[in-house]
């Protein structure tokens, strides 16, 4: 039995996930238990996609947060952890400098992972959790800074691409016409090349959209295009404050949920899909589960 953790520093939020792994547990549901999950609306992308760097204020906030994460890991007897930063830290001109400072003050080494590795981590976890071995699937993870699209064909990762087209970038008008064109071209080609493709959606926004649609449907793991269009048409005209009240959204979700819905609507159009599978798998899950697999493989050597 071991307690492991993952830290995911995204462009919109930062997450700490602690899980207990017990491969010898009799009941399957006891083999992996979530002990703690914390999400902080850090909003790194707000700085990076406008200033090009992490501001002093955000850096200070990040330091306090990482010190807190360290204490939570101590309290939960975490044996090992992996800490990763994605799109915003990749783009920040002072990203490496900030991470060195954090490591010096907290002892937590944060890795800046490339979009390709991000997609690979998510894909590995997806194969573990879903029956996606036959047919073609487009695994789409929409974050604050980037959107990862991975094509899985008959259980094999066929193609993967990271687009600088995240929700915070869209809100700040930082998505180029070239990126949008490439997204459309690639997804249209996938539809022609791989035929009937099913979309698997990932990220806090699609999870929330699916949850909002859930009360009116039987299938909790599938969000239809009609439901997504209906929710979008209801939310889009509202102000951020009105969305918070009408849909019980937090402030840091009420603004980004609109561009996220737009990305998924475009994906459905280009891939000719009528629904999105939402298995509720996050990058934080993928990181900690990947760490466990790695540790188990070492013990078997």
Task: Please provide the spans of the model-predicted regions.
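Short glycine-aspartate micro-motif
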Residues: 4-8, 137-141, 199
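Conserved Rossmann-like nucleotide-cofactor binding loop
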Residues: 12-14, 145, 207
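N-terminal basic/disordered segments at the start of proteins
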Residues: 2-32
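Acidic, divalent-metal-coordinating active-site segment for phosphoryl/phosphodiester hydrolysis
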Residues: 144-151
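Conserved ATP-binding subdomain of kinase catalytic cores across diverse folds
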Residues: 27-43, 48, 64-67, 74
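Helical "lid/coupling" subdomains associated with nucleotide-phosphate turnover
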Residues: 18, 47-78, 86-136, 151-301
């Amino acid at each position: 039995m071991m307690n492991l953790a993952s830290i995911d520093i995204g462009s919109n939020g930062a997450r700490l996930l602690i899980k207990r792994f017990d491969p010898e547990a009799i009941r399957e549901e006891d083999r992996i238990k979530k002990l703690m999950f914390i999400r902080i609306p850090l909003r790194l992308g707000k700085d990076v996609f406008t200033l090009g760097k992490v501001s002093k204020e955000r850096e200070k906030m990040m330091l306090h947060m990482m010190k807190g994460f360290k204490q939570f890991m101590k309290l939960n007897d975490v044996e090992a952890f992996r800490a990763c930063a994605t799109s915003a830290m990749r783009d920040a001109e002072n990203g490496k400098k900030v991470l060195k400072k954090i490591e010096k003050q907290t002892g937590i080494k944060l890795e800046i992972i490339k979009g390709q590795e991000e997609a690979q981590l998510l894909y590995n976890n997806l194969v573990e959790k879903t029956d996606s071995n036959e047919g073609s699937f487009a695994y789409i993870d929409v974050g604050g800074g980037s959107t990862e699209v991975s094509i899985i064909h008959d259980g094999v990762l066929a193609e993967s691409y990271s687009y600088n087209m995240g929700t915070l970038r869209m809100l700040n008008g930082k998505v180029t016409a070239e990126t949008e064109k490439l997204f459309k071209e690639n997804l249209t080609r996938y539809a022609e090349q791989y035929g009937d493709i099913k979309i698997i959606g990932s990220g806090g926004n699609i999870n929330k959209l699916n949850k909002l649609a859930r009360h009116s449907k039987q299938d909790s793991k599938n969000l239809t295009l009609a439901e997504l269009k209906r929710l979008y048409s209801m939310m889009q005209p509202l102000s951020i404050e009105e969305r918070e009240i009408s849909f019980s959204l937090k402030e840091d979700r009420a603004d980004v949920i609109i561009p996220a819905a737009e990305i998924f609507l475009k994906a459905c159009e280009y891939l000719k899909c009528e629904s999105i599978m939402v298995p509720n798998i996050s990058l934080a899950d993928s990181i900690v589960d990947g760490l466990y697999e790695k540790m188990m493989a070492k013990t078997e050597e």
